[in-house]
């Protein structure tokens, strides 16, 4: 059964993120119009740590919902986890409906090259690092680090599309997840905290 949404907002104008939402809603809500909205993540251009990435996705979704008349809004955020001497790529999607329901999904981790880990620790943004290492331009708006490192086997859009689909599960099966307002109940836990970042569409 298709989702009942007629309008959806996405808290980004990044083409890779916008296409991920359009791809999945094209399957789950074919009549839904998607509006990209440029909103701040509140956690800077290079979120570091799972909590920061999650907070950024949440902030994007809520800001997009507030700035639009959409039935549902999506926040997509990518970032890195620094652990010991390694850096891991990760991502998070938050979806919030006009009536207060919440959907969420997160990536597993992808190990980044050690040279990228060193430069992330030095304060650089991953997109800039990847562009420099592979002689690309604005890769984060296209295939992304995932697409480049996997030689196109999976793009940034592909990875985010999986998360968008999974974040829609509570809306597809409200009887299983509960149709009351979990977004309100969990707002405090999801909201921005003091998270590590270095000050992306």
Regions flagged by a language model, labelled:
Residues 1-70:
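N-terminal polybasic phosphate/anion-binding patch
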Residues 46-189:
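Anionic-ligand binding patches
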Residues 1-6, 174-201:
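SAM-dependent methyltransferases
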Residues 17, 81-85, 197-200:
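Residues at secondary-structure transition points
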